């Protein structure tokens, strides 16, 4: 009898492990459409399938947020919308979306990865304005979900990589603009992020000027990134002029697209997310407010 019980023990442990894993996967895969009936003006494209291969996703016609919930035991109440890069032609959803979200979860921050419409994709029907509508709607939508997901509305930020950094910057520096087609209760909410994180942001991120009401900002790039280190330097100068808090990390090497540093052979880049974690803590963003 004892032998039978012992033989069942590994099976029970394995079953419990699988249940935990599948529960985590189900939680990670919670997809929230930005508009229940599809993007305004493009409702008929809502059910067109996305294309995904290896590291990219494209043909996004029903923009959405994928919610990654921080473990309840360490949840701080903060949240961030993550905009992956991809040159507005594709989305680097895993390396610049899901990986970033899981890191945020590890330090107690809820994360929403944005799938936005791509205005440079081949044969696209979308414009830059449609892309802006997506990121503005995303911020307002997260605000509308704050009570349900136990999010502190004073600590909702935006993070972007490369082209996604341009979206984050459009939101942070132009949050007072509307960028919606039809009004509903969600569109009445503020689009202003409480903080922004720009990782090798594209050149379209740079505004004409930085307002004193712009959010506190974390900037990071490699100096040998000829595309996307210049915007970081320019934004630093603009933030200093406006006296808006900013922290900058400019690495000697790394070029473009090192993502969360996982595959980098450079120690400095491999550990860059820890610099972000330090800043989030020092800024009071990731400090628990239970």
Language-model segments: residues:
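Short beta-strand/loop motif that positions the catalytic acidic residue
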Residues: 218-221
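Conserved alpha/beta-hydrolase "acid-adjacent" motif
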Residues: 226-233
